[in-house]
Regions:
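N-terminal leader/targeting segments and the immediate start of mature chains
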Residues: 2, 30-72, 82, 224-235
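N-terminal post-signal-peptidase region of extra-cytosolic proteins
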Residues: 43, 64, 73-75, 83-93, ...
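An acidic-aromatic
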Residues: 78-130, 202
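Short hydrophobic/aromatic-rich beta-strand segments that constitute the beta-sheet cores
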Residues: 60, 87-91, 106-109, 165, ...
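N-terminal secretory signal peptides that target proteins for export/translocation
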Residues: 1-13
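Bacterial N-terminal signal peptides
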Residues: 17-28
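Gly/Pro-enriched, hydrophobic low-complexity segments
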Residues: 36, 123, 143-235
C-alpha cells in the first residue's frame, strides 16, 4: 500500500482539477493492485483445498462454444475423482457418455457422437493431456502459469474470486488461458473456463460438491460394451 501511495504523488500539480483526477486514479488503482497481489494467495488456498480432498463428487454442467464451426452445446452429469490419478465424467445428458481414468488408462466412450467405439490411452501425467479439469490446473500451478486477479464474482449464491491462469510457455499447451472461480468460504474451485487454442471456449460448472466421501471402486472402471471397437490412442 505504501508503494501505491508513492507512485501517486503529484510533483508539479496543474491546478485543482489535475490533483483531483490524480487522487481519484490512485484511489481506484490501489484496490486493483491489492487484489492482483492476493491472486497467488487465493490460488495457494485453492491448491491446498484440492489436495485436502482425497475424493470429490459433484454434479457438472458443461457449456461448449466453438466459433470455428458456429456451434454450441450444453451437457451435464456427475464428476468424480479420487487421488491419485482417478476421475470420471459420467454424463446424464447425453446419457451413456463417459470419460474416465482408472489410475493407469484413460477411457473415452462417447456413443452420442462416436457410436460403436471406445478410445483408450495411457495416462502420461504431462500438462495439457489430462481431462481432469481440477488436477490439470491445480497441480503445481505456480510453476506452469502466470496468475492474475480478474474480479470478485459469485457462483450461484456463493461468493467467489475469479482468477486468470496463462501458461508461462505459450504454444506448448492446447489452451491459451484458463479462468477459475475460487469459493471464498472453502477455497474449492467451482467453475472453470478453458479458452482453447482453436478458439473454442469450454466452461464447466461444479455444483453440489462433496469432498472426502466414499466412492465405490466401480466408479472408475470401464468395460467396453459388447460389439464396441476399442481404439488404442497411446503414444
Amino acid at each position: 500500500m505504501t508503494t501505491a501511495r508513492r507512485s501517486c504523488r503529484v510533483a508539479d500539480p496543474r491546478g485543482l482539477a489535475w490533483v483531483a483526477a490524480t487522487v481519484a486514479l490512485c484511489a481506484a488503482s490501489a484496490p486493483a493492485l491489492a487484489q492482483n497481489a492476493s491472486a497467488p494467495a487465493i490460488l495457494d488456498g485453492a491448491v491446498a483445498a484440492f489436495h485436502r480432498a482425497t475424493t470429490l463428487r459433484a454434479d457438472f454442467t458443461q457449456y461448449l462454444r466453438d466459433p470455428m464451426v458456429g456451434s454450441s452445446d450444453t451437457s451435464s452429469g456427475e464428476f468424480l475423482r479420487q487421488s491419485p490419478g482417478k476421475f470420471a465424467f459420467r454424463w446424464r445428458h447425453p446419457a451413456g457418455d463417459v470419460i474416465l481414468a482408472d489410475g493407469q488408462v484413460l477411457w473415452a466412450y462417447l456413443p452420442s457422437s462416436s457410436p460403436g467405439q471406445a478410445v483408450r490411452s495411457t495416462l502420461t501425467g504431462r500438462p495439457g493431456e489430462s481431462a481432469d479439469v481440477l488436477a490439470e490446473f491445480l497441480d503445481d500451478p505456480a510453476q506452469r502459469f502466470l496468475v492474475s486477479y480478474v474480479r470478485p464474482d459469485s457462483v450461484g449464491a456463493r461468493p467467489a474470486d475469479e482468477l486468470a491462469l496463462v501458461p508461462r510457455q505459450q504454444g506448448t499447451l492446447p489452451y491459451r488461458r484458463v479462468l477459475i472461480w475460487v469459493d471464498r468460504a472453502d477455497s474449492l474451485v467451482r467453475r472453470v473456463e478453458i479458452n482453447e487454442g482453436s478458439g473454442a471456449v469450454r466452461r464447466i460448472l461444479l455444483d453440489q460438491i462433496r469432498v472426502n466421501v466414499p466412492i465405490p471402486a466401480s466408479a472408475f472402471m470401464f468395460r467396453p460394451p459388447k460389439g464396441v471397437r476399442v481404439v488404442d490412442a497411446s503414444h
